[in-house]
A protein has these predicted regions:
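Catalytic palm subdomain of template-directed nucleic-acid polymerases
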Residues: 61
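C-terminal structural segments of small proteins and small subunits
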Residues: 80-87
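Short S/T/G/P-rich N-terminal loop/turn motif that feeds into the first structured element of a domain
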Residues: 1-56, 65-73, 89-105
Length: 105
């Protein structure tokens, strides 16, 4: 079962990746798993949450904008982005937001 990320006290940043997939599935699951594994090793990474139906939403949490920029520039992540553009995504949008408050149980 997916879990909710255990994030620190705000402020921190959320990268919200919303997508609609193509029908091409070759290599997608392995790459998605690798990206979560690799992101978790990056400085400033705080956690990730993901859900998919017709529209997929993945939210990764980061300590600062510099960490997000470094992750975007990571060589393996750039390869995943290239394959996503070419094969896996029909549409996508990435949004970056500053989390100023959070609460929950």
């Amino acid at each position: 079962m997916p879990s909710i990320a255990n994030t620190p006290e705000p402020p921190y940043y959320a990268v919200i990746f919303t997508s609609q997939r193509t029908e091409i599935d070759i290599g997608y699951d392995a790459m998605a798993a690798r990206m979560v594994e690799l992101a978790a090793q990056q400085p400033g990474f705080l956690g990730v949450e993901s859900a998919r139906n017709e529209v997929g939403v993945t939210v990764s949490y980061w300590a600062d904008l510099a960490s997000i920029k470094a992750w975007k520039a990571h060589a393996e992540h750039q390869e995943a982005q290239r394959l996503g553009h070419q094969q896996w995504y029909q549409h996508f949008k990435t949004r970056i937001a500053k989390v100023e408050r959070d609460y929950g149980i």
